[in-house]
Design a protein with these regions (language model features):
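Short, glycine/acidic-enriched loop or turn micro-motifs at the edges of active sites
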Residues: 59-61, 83, 145
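Histidine/acidic-residue-rich, glycine-tolerant segments that coordinate divalent metal ions
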Residues: 68-78, 85, 103-202
Length: 202
């Protein structure tokens, strides 16, 4: 996966690879949910309880500069947020659950495209994800470089960073060059705003 990254909502080959893997583990697989989303289900025992385990699998539009055997083969596209790792971990967990079958109920492996552009989850949900594949809870995770091997962090509520888009509109006011005090200079206001906002984190 790391060698063959695909951008958000372009993950056709990655989705095929994932579907083939979970089919080989014995899961019932549904593809094309919200375009490239995948749900793989496995029922064991007689319980009506079900859980979802979720991972994302899109890459970023960034050039990888590492010189490693598994370096991205695509110019300007790379798995630099670790979504290949997330999917690999979920595939490994899915394989383990299928081999051991040490649970009672249904496990659903949810593979989400387009996390980086915030398109994948809404697309899957709008396509009936939870109506077609009801679950009592969904568990997800994100890699965190710097943790020791085998460590996990848990918390209630939000954790790690998120991306939101918002806009600020600055409205200037023109004036005569001899009377600048009667105007509002949007360039000065915008420059001050950029510096003030950046000072929040630096």
């Amino acid at each position: 996966m790391h060698k063959n990254p695909e951008l958000s909502m372009q993950e056709e080959e990655t989705a095929k690879f994932i579907a083939d893997q979970v089919k080989s583990f014995g899961y019932k697989v549904e593809t094309g949910i919200g375009k490239y989303g995948i749900v793989a289900s496995l029922k064991v025992g007689d319980s009506d309880k079900s859980i979802g385990l979720r991972a994302d699998f899109d890459a970023l539009p960034i050039q990888e500069v590492n010189d490693l055997p598994y370096k991205s083969k695509k110019e300007g596209v790379a798995h630099l947020c670790g979504h290949d790792g997330h999917t690999s971990m979920l595939l490994a967990a899915g394989k383990y659950l299928a081999e051991t079958r040490n649970f009672n109920g249904t496990v659903r492996l949810i593979f989400q495209p387009a996390e980086e552009t915030m398109e994948g989850a809404p697309a899957m949900i709008d396509d009936g994800l939870f109506e077609k594949f009801p679950v009592d809870a969904v568990f997800g995770m994100h890699n965190m470089p710097g943790l020791k091997l085998g460590q996990f962090y848990f918390t209630d509520g939000e954790v790690m960073a998120a991306v939101d888009n918002w806009e600020i509109e600055i409205t200037g006011k023109g004036s005569h060059g001899a009377m600048p005090e009667h105007g509002i200079d949007p360039i000065v206001a915008g420059s001050s705003l950029v510096m003030a906002l950046q000072s929040i984190v630096s």
